[in-house]
Amino acid sequence: MRYFKIFFISWLLISLISKSFSKDFGTEEEAKNMLERAVNLINYDKIYALNIFTERKGGFNFKDLYPFCADASGILTGHPFNVGFDLLTFIDSDGKNVGKEFLQVAQVGKINKVTFKITYPKDTIKTKDKEYEKTALVTRVGDQICAVGYHNN
């Protein structure tokens, strides 16, 4: 009986931790749905869409998910915190040029994946200065390269 209690308490703790994580972080399916909605909005009105993405409005702020877009040269044109940032300078801890890969894999009508590592600042409550693996779903729509990233772990 004692082992059952230990097992049950351990299972309960793991279950609570995993549910807490899933509430904070979006899934691949949720990211894909958001990217598809973002593409539709860009096709309808690009300027309006980029403003909505930057302001994180219109349902484009779900858990930790948000769409972002860059022009063909890699400059972010729609992003909640980094409009004007050059994606080509985004290099992860493994030395991978993430921005360059975004530009290379983006194709009209197709969603491709770019996986990379990212560390968040210590003052971010969810992350506590831990490195995470993320995957961005990337596509091209008109003259924009757009993506939504989700955590893998």
Model-derived regions: residue spans:
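Extracellular/periplasmic ligand-binding regions of membrane signal-transduction receptors
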Residues: 25-51
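Extracytoplasmic/periplasmic helical hairpin
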Residues: 42-69
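N-terminal signal peptide c-region/cleavage motif recognized by signal peptidases
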Residues: 17-20
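Soluble sensory domains of the PAS superfamily and closely related sensory modules
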Residues: 35, 45, 98-122
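Bacterial N-terminal signal peptides that target proteins for export
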Residues: 1-7
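Sensory/regulatory domains in signal-transduction proteins
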Residues: 112-153
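Bacterial N-terminal signal peptides
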Residues: 7-15
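Extracytoplasmic ligand-binding sensor domains of the Cache superfamily
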Residues: 60-109
